[in-house]
Amino acid sequence: MHGLLLAGLLALPLNVFAHPTESHSSGVSRRAIDITSYRLPQISKYTKSDAVPKQDGESFTTSSTGDDNVSSGDYVTTATNWLKKTLPKATYRLVNDHYIGDSGIGHVHFRQTAHGIDIDNTDFNVNIGRDGKVFSFGNSFYDGEIPKANPMVKRDFSDPVNALHGAIQTLNLPVTAKPENVKAKPVEGKENFKFEGTSGALSDPKAQLVYLQKDGGLVLSWKVETDVGDNWLLTYVDANKNDQVHSVVDYVSAAEYQVYPWGINDPTEGNRTTIHLPWLKTLSTDWHIDGKGWYPTTRGNNAIAQENPTGHPEYENNYRPKSPLFIFKYPYSPAMTPPSSYRDASITQLFYTTNVYHDVLYILGFNEKAGNFQINNWNKGGVGGDFAILNSQDGSGVNNANFATPPDGQPGRMRMYTWNASTPERDGCFEAGIVIHEYTHGVSNRLTGGPENSRCLAALESGGMGEGWSDFFATAIRLKAGDTRATDYTMGEWASNRPNGIRKYRYSTSLTTNPHMYVDADGLTSVHAIGTIWASMLYELLWNLIDKHGKGDVTKIRPVLKNGVPTDGRHLAMKIVLDGMALQPCLPNFVQARDAILDADKNLTQGSNKCEIWKAFAKRGLGVGAAFNQTKRTGSNELPAGC
C-alpha cells in the first residue's frame, strides 16, 4: 500500500497516521496481519552503461521524438538477441509494453517462463541507446534447476477457488466467497481465471497459475488478485498447500479555477487565486475532453475527481461540481467547518493539482508509451482507459492518503482524507505536496519494470525508494525563487499540524539538520523511514544541479527544454530521476537506482553532471564503495576518479 504516512518512522503518539480506529477502512487490518512480512525478495541485478560488454554488429538509431517507425521493431530484436546471448538457456516471453522514451532510449521487458508458465518475479529489462546498442540492462531471472515435471500434464495443482479461499483466510481479507456461490470463469491466458459470485471486493477477484522464485527454487503458486480498497493485493498462494502464502504485493501506495496555484504547497504559503486555462499544451485537448465528450465538471482525459464521504468504491455517480461555463470558483478558508461545507473547493483543488502535475510529467517524459494515466492515448502508444480516480474527503480513513497503481490500462486510484490533528480539521487536498506524493507512486510504479508490471517496488528497499521519490518530487516542485541550498523543507507539515512535518528529519543539505546516511537503512522495516534516506540523497542531487544550472523561473509551470534537456537544474534533476526509473531493474536497491540515475544523465547530457551526481550520493554514504545487503549495508563517501 502506497500511503503517505503508514510509517513507524514517525515515533509519534499519532498512530492515527497508520489506519486509525476512526477509519472505516475495508483493507487488511495491519494489527492482525502484517502483509509487509510477505514482501518479495530483492534479487535484481543492474549492469550500468559503462559495465556493458563491448558489442559488435549492426545497430539502429532510436528516435528522440519517440516515433515508432521502421526501426521500432529493430530495438526489440536487438534486446531479444542480447537476452539470448546473455542467458542462452532461458525460456521467456516478451512483455508487450516496450517503447522508445523521449530521451531516445528503447525500453524492452521480458518475463521468464517454465513449461509455458510465467515465473512471476523474474524480469529482464534491456535499455537500447541512441546508437542502437545495449545501453544498460537489469536481470532477476532464475538460474537454478527448472522442475522437470510439467504441472500442466497431470494437472498437479489445486482448484483456483481453493486458492482464493486460502488468500482470504490467511490474510483475513474482507471478502466473502461461499463455495456454493463462487465460480472460476476462464479468461484469456493459460490457467487464468476471474471469480464470480464473491462479495466484499471492489472488483471480481482473479487468479493465475504462476511460478514464484523463492529461497533458491521455484514454487508453483496461484497469483490471487483482490482489490479491497485500502489494499489491492497480489497474493501468491501455494498451488498445492492453499493455506500457505509465499508472497504478497500491494498495488496501493494514497477553464477557470479558484485554487492555490502551482508552487503554493499549502494555505500558509499563499492565497487562492483564479487561474484561466491552466493546462499545458502537451496534448491537443484541455482537461475536460477525453475524445468522447466535453465534461462541464471535474472530469476529463487525465482524471475524474469527486467527493467520497462514505469511502465506497463507487465513484462515477458520486457528487462533483458542475459548471456549464467551466468556471470552478467556490469559497474556502482553513477556518471553515465541516469539510463538507467546502467540498466543491476541495474537489476543484485536487483536480487542478493533479492535472498540472500530469502535464509537467508529460513534458518530462511520462507520456502514453511510458504508461501514464489517460483514458484516451490519442494513438500515441501505451494502453488507454486509465485516468486517475481522485477521491476528495474520502471516508475510508483519516490523517492519511494513498494511491493504488494497477498495470497500464487500469485506472489509478487516489484517496485523499481529512486530518483531525487541528481544530478545525484540515483537508489534505489543499496540501499540494500530499497530492503530488501520492500521484508520484503511480509514476514510479509504472516506470520501474515497465508499464505492465506494477510489482517492481514491492521489496523493502524498492518500496522505500518509492516513498523517497514521492517526497522528492513534492519538495522539488514547491521550491521558491529565494531558496538556496540552505533552505530546509518538511513533508505534511500543514495537514498534520506539526511544525517539523511527518518525517524524522527535515529535507536539508545540512548534515546537522538531517544526518541521514545510507547505512541508516540497516534494521529499518518501514518503507517511509527508508524513503526519507533516499529522498535526502535526492535533495542533495537537486541542489547540486541547481547550483550548476540555476533553478529557472519557479513561477512558470512549464519546464523549458532544449534538445530534450531541461535548461534549469530543478527540472533536470526531476528528468534524470524519471529516466532512471525507466532504466533500473525491477525491484531495485539504492545502489542500482543511483547507477540508473548516472546512466540517465550519461544518455541525456553525455554525463556532463556525473560529478554533481556522485557528490550528492557520496555525501550521504552511497559513494563508489557502497554495497547493498539487506541487513548490513556498506557505506562509502568515495568519489570516482576525476571528481
From Swiss-Prot:
GO molecular function terms listed in the Swiss-Prot or TrEMBL record: metalloendopeptidase activity; zinc ion binding
Cited Pfam families: FTP, Peptidase_M36
Listed transmembrane segments: none
Signal peptide: 1-18
GO CC term, one of those recorded: extracellular region
Cofactor note: Binds 1 zinc ion per subunit.
The protein's Enzyme Commission number: 3.4.24.-
Function description: Secreted metalloproteinase probably acting as a virulence factor.
Protein name: Probable extracellular metalloproteinase 4
Lineage of source species: Eukaryota, Fungi, Dikarya, Ascomycota, Pezizomycotina
